[in-house]
Amino acid sequence: VIDRRAGLPHWSPLLFGVVVLAGVGVTAASVLTSVPVAPGVPAPPGSVRFALPALRLAVDACSVASVGLGVLPLLLRGLRPNRTRPVLVRAHKLGLGLGAVWALAALLLLWAQAAELAPSGFGLGTAELARYAAEVGAGRALLVAGACALATAVLHAASLRPHARPPEELPVLVALLGQLPLALTGHSAAAANHELALLSMSVHVMAASAWVGGLGVLLFLVVPERSLLVTALPRFAAVGTVCLCAVAVSGVVNAVVQLTGRPEIGWAAALLSTGYGWVVLTKTAALGVLAGLGGWLRFRLMPAVLRHRAVPVTLWLGLELLVMGLAIGLAAALARASLS
């Protein structure tokens, strides 16, 4: 739907659907992968248990969107500036605000993670919070993520200036860098074969971010400009295919490492009889659906777009993004979970 008065798409229903599906995914996966508190260990307050997956989802969503905004200039590279400048200005303004929100979400997640270990929950003091941030790997990772988030905001702000703009590749590189610390301090770090687990998780996170974030900016910023879509869609299709393959392969590797980490259970039983395994199966099903939607878009709809025919690109990209929202929610919960 196009709001002719503003000249911008009115995406509220779609964004609401993505948020709802992401929330459903993170809630369901958190319930499935929850483990009882060990005897003698005080359970964190309910507010902390609720806030942790929600804030992790917020951090992941902001970082993915930041990667997508960083990818956009690369999809439009080589086109005349008078055609791309209006879209890029909107993207840089969004990137400026999103970087600040990402940094804030990272700090709130840092607070929630420290509160999980503190007897007083969210009432912990600044000294306890500072100790967690300085001494715990997950705390340091969030500080790095927050710094990268602020750096992306600064880079987007600099790109709004008419002169002395930073290199086009820099925002996406910094956004990807901001994702790695959390990937390297999650459950993969505790896996038996942690080197392989960390490598596969890093590839998985970066490829998924470029794919999901790229599709989001394509849908929200490029689709309304059909003259730009003819150039950007084939480029994104090529990037998306590579990212899909990387996500699939790295996801399988990481799942195998995690599911074989408990020899007394056996990988088949771990996959079929644990909450962790069910979440992995659900993510795999979502990936299969995304592959089907992406294949239809690339081989059936894209040729029509290149011939400037009217086709429902928005519908198919919107369906992809809805499924991706569910997958991001599952991943946000899975990042904090372990095979139990």
Predicted regions and their residues:
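Polytopic transmembrane helical bundles with strong interfacial aromatic enrichment
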Residues: 1-340
